[in-house]
Amino acid sequence: PRKGEEMILDKKASALMDTVMGKFDISSSASHTKGGGILVTADNNLLLGPNAVETPLREDLSTTPEGIDMVIKKQQMLMPRLSKGSIITYFAGVRASTYEEQFVIERSKKVENFVQAAGIQSPGITAAPAIAQDITKYCIDAIGESISKNEKFNPIRKPIPKVRELPREERDKLIKKNPDYGVIICRCEEISKGEIIDALQSPLKVPTIDGIKRRVRAGMGRCQGGFCSPQIVKIIAEHEGIAIDQVAKKQQGSEVICMGKSTGFL
């Protein structure tokens, strides 16, 4: 496995650039990484990294001061004004890399009905649609039956309204129709109570703090949920009809509020 550490910067830092940049040492052809880069995300944050560090543990999602320094120093060669003070969060992911540095997209030779999509690194971002088509063919072959395309399938779903992006007139109409859209819960990202409830009522339920964050970005701003998390916990608990100490950050066992007896110590 190969771990990569990345950083997300405050939206204010996006004023430094509006494109994708990367520095690659062409003299090091044996390198297993381009060294990451700088890019503006769809939500207008700057994303730095990743680096590439071999790890024996496939679930090693730890970040290190050394890794963060490595990424920052490398990207400062492209943009000297980058500062650690702009970092709002950092994280790591692990890639199933191969020593051949090649994609492995094929039906398993040992496990029935198992399709492998491994060894996929940075190029996988652009290759994903083609990879999905190949895997679809492998799955159909594995089933061994003739499958017809559902012509009635509609891949377009109605999105959750983004209050912060609406013109004033449309926002006023939406709030008059449902006042919850006028209650701003996440100040950093301007996410309303109505948007959070929409996410909780979606076909694929996400009654966790991280689930709401990924659906509507509540908690993804500068304070990283420091202000809005308690309100989000309350909204989830009320909507789901559960106690606040049953609301999890990500999954069962990651509840964020303890309602047990006090031991008398702080």
Where are these regions (language model features)?
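C-terminal catalytic lobe of FAD-dependent flavoproteins
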Residues: 25-27, 32-35, 42-43, 54-184, ...
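Iron-sulfur (Fe-S) cluster-binding segments and ferredoxin-like electron-carrier domains
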Residues: 59, 192-203, 226-244
